[in-house]
Amino acid sequence: MNLDNMVEGDDLLKLKDKINKVFFFRICGTGMGASACLLKEAGIEVEGADQSFSPPMSTYLDSTGIPCYSLDKVDKKFLQKYDLIIVGNSVPKVSDHAKLIEDCGVPFTSFPSVLGSFVLKDKEVIGLAGTHGKTTTTYFLTQMLESLGEKPGYFIGGIMDNRPPSKIGESKFFAIESDEYDSAYFQKYSKFRLYELNSMVLTSLEFDHADIYDSVEDIEK
């Protein structure tokens, strides 16, 4: 595994003003698609690719005008026209795709990293975590804040009620679905560790994701 071009934290933040065009490698995942929409809203040119495109995320991505390609069209020369590659956690550590990303010479990171560095800075971030109910509870919290007159930012891991899955918002509040699963093959820890949460709502806690956790106590840690 060659992580010479992997960026996160302060190193990623330093690149922010130099990033004009971003590529999402496996864009059709719910988190990846929602992240792509946030960066597009922030004024960054966004494109992506995946092996297959399934609704509802594929339908929503199509409506945004974000160019999406088949992964079989993606090679080193293709990737080198981008300033940053966002890698989905469906990319295995030992794979041709991982090697392609590592060897193309372009900085790469995960979507939780880019959200933490590019979107959530200076926001009052409320994380919604738990084994069950994260998406629904994030949606409810967003509606509650809106009913109080706020225009919050939000990040929901799904398409609900014909609203975008994510929005930067105008108020200081940002509600974000905070998944305990790993961020990427090069960041084998929970996504919410990269969000710098101000507060967290924990909906439930059960043993899950046996591929990265040994027990419910391991998840608690």
Where is each model-derived feature located?
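N-terminal leader/targeting and accessory segments in enzymes
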Residues: M1-S110, V114, V216
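Phosphate-binding loop of NTP-binding sites
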Residues: L38-E41, K76-K77, N89, K93-K221
